[in-house]
């Protein structure tokens, strides 16, 4: 099989074989040989050779290729959505929205580059000051499995627009989506070597991250892996490292008038994409008293009716499987540890079949758990924390090393003003789900959630470096000389 895309050609990998599986059926979705260290070296060398020509290409010419990519995505929406659903378990209705977001991101990325990193001029008394932006060179892009099309392209598109060349290492759990996406780039007319694909598992990733000829590494994925990368590049200031990672995100519930609206937004926050969005709410803060009890009863009632099914089921389910049977088992195990520490299940999570990734959406009350672990459980496991005062809720919401997203559901505008001033997160929403974000706004967090704003408007900032010039069209001796100079 030809699994790798290097220097404009599909070639076979020379590393170990691996496969991806449909988490809802356990059927093999993709299989092939991974990229060895030698394959990775060839991919980086190809990107290095292509850099001079690609970066010298007119900005508009680069953008035309990227626009063709977006148009082809729209044409192939159903095929790519099917590939996403097959490998991730994500229902087709949601996979289709991912492909649409991939295409829409192109226009935003072009606008962002022009507005944030385009050329700017300022007249001076004896010339002009010019700010330009230059690409870094060869950048490695590491993609996650939860949005295997959308999130890698949130790095790749702005990197290419800026004039960089790319070596792309997708998640080993979604190699088929990566291949389908790169095929679209190839058809769009991307020159050989500008984008290279290396498939593989941990060893492939290590070979790419350790390569001495990359100029940047753009990563979306777990905080644990991102932290390792940050430590690895701690002594290499020449490497541009952009990290977008996870969160232990809080959603604070106020005593609102519309109970069902609050329940709906809570379910969307906690269980959309089977809880596999980095912005999903992990901790739900509920007021003590009668309202809190009514809210939890209604939340449990609606949640208990949520079904999970295969990605192409008819009718479509709200949730699909989580990414793998192993991931499902880890979620159930995390729940068990919390129960051992004193948590009380409201709806207990179970794994439908040990071979598959199906788990039910679960709600567990952790109010009485001392020293609650500050962990991101990447799935539909909602932890309930009851609070006595609004200030207590905010204090406990901020008690995390992460800082990606946070939300408040409340009718009181004064409560919102206080919340947005005191909460610590990069995405803070009011009366909207925590995982609602605009591609035209910064996307990212603070603390262990990352150090840049990839996959959105601000991605242009780390894809090129600023170059300042002071220029004059005519070389002349200045009228006033420095002391001690005689002509």
From Swiss-Prot:
Pfam families named in the record: Aldedh
Catalytic activity: N-succinyl-L-glutamate 5-semialdehyde + NAD(+) + H2O = N-succinyl-L-glutamate + NADH + 2 H(+)
Active site: 244, 278
Chain sites annotated for binding NAD(+): 221-226
UniProt pathway annotation: Amino-acid degradation; L-arginine degradation via AST pathway; L-glutamate and succinate from L-arginine: step 4/5
UniProt GO BP: arginine catabolic process to glutamate; arginine catabolic process to succinate
InterPro entries per record: Ald_DH/histidinol_DH, Ald_DH_C, Ald_DH_CS_CYS, Ald_DH_CS_GLU, Ald_DH_N, Aldehyde_DH_dom, SuccinylGlu_semiald_DH_AstD
Domain of life: Bacteria
Keyword line: Arginine metabolism, NAD, Oxidoreductase
Alphabetical list of Gene3D superfamilies matching this protein: Aldehyde Dehydrogenase, Chain A, domain 1, Aldehyde Dehydrogenase, Chain A, domain 2
PROSITE patterns: ALDEHYDE_DEHYDR_CYS, ALDEHYDE_DEHYDR_GLU
GO MF terms, alphabetically ordered: succinylglutamate-semialdehyde dehydrogenase activity
UniProt EC number: 1.2.1.71
Job of this protein: Catalyzes the NAD-dependent reduction of succinylglutamate semialdehyde into succinylglutamate.
UniProt-listed NCBIfam families: arg_catab_astD, PRK09457.1
Family (UniProt): Belongs to the aldehyde dehydrogenase family. AstD subfamily.
Protein name: N-succinylglutamate 5-semialdehyde dehydrogenase
Source organism of the structure: Burkholderia ambifaria (strain ATCC BAA-244 / DSM 16087 / CCUG 44356 / LMG 19182 / AMMD) (Burkholderia cepacia (strain AMMD))
Encoding gene per record: astD
